[in-house]
């Protein structure tokens, strides 16, 4: 009798435990498997049309051989819907869509997408994406894909942080001047950014790297994308010369060349900015000599020699009182002026007007 009562007490408990275990097993069966995440790389997305909008693209390697990209933008408008894509080539070159990254919600500034292939079905892994020749565009809206709110080079096109900036001085128009900055890419190529002040709205200004120094002049080696007069900006990928010779970041630093920015395609003879680059860059070391008047007491000036990276020099003769239209030859002679001597070196003539 006592045994039966004990069984009555334990039987409901046993059945209850079986039901709980059964429910627990059912829950485990319906839960999706968790995908682990491994290495990650973050790329910067710079502002384009709106200087307040910028962000990052975090690329994540998943354990199941898929890739997740998390886009995070700051200051996107509430309610905005911003399509994003990975494109082929660099941002400076432009290219077709490789991978669709979904929509960045303006309210959160975020978008997350996981994939294992390009839009055309070509498989891609995390490692392949780190070496990909591409860039990311985030657009204003599906109806305005032409307006970009953020952009950044990725993969082999990522910038290393190494850069070199050259000054571009004014030529025909004293209010136009600026800089040319070359930034190294992971693949050894370079992003060239020309930034000019004082360019006219609507102006289109061709630019080139020429052979030799500016004072010597020379043929065109490399063609930049034209400078937009409204923004004063030009961006160009630097990978090869016009003759298809390889030409990357390290080559820029050593080139025997100079940059010319022209007024327009129809007036290449008028220069708006110019600067020596590469081995012709000036080091900042200089020496100035006085040139006293001789036959005409109102004409006098200076001769300044500025050292170049390659050890050569830029000689600038500056005279006051020269007549408009005058052309005045100049030379370095042997010995002292009081002794006199033969010609050792010939300068380019002094332009009397300037």
Give the positions of each predicted feature:
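C-terminal motif of bacterial Sec signal peptides marking the signal peptidase cleavage site
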Residues: 18-22
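Bacterial N-terminal signal peptides that target proteins for export
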Residues: 2-11
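N-terminal leader/targeting pre-sequences
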Residues: 24-354
